[in-house]
């Protein structure tokens, strides 16, 4: 169904919980996704496990937001030292399809921090095909601007 990647490592729930979690630092339900030690899902079991884990974390973020009468969530993705070659496109497509079904119109903001330059250039092309409301939810920032823009973006 998904093919395989060159990695033979299995993704554990423990390793996922260190990379993907709900922030305790903000009141709004915010998912933190750090790719620092990311192991790309390499087989069907890993893809399903990672997708289920991410959906569970998003559910927790939504529940946290609902405590303050909101029904949306934010995502901060830290792409420090991430390489485009690490992407398993089948996983990304599967994850995106599942999340669109489970959480339609629930994303408030997505902030991508320190994306590789190829990602920035690709996003410049892709965003032309996105509708304006979706584009308004997306932000790409660098580490130099991180602290300044985080509050402005997330607290609008």
Regions found by a protein language model. Give the residues of each.
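SEC14/CRAL-TRIO lipid-binding/transfer domains and related phosphoinositide-recognition modules
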Residues: 1-105, 109-156
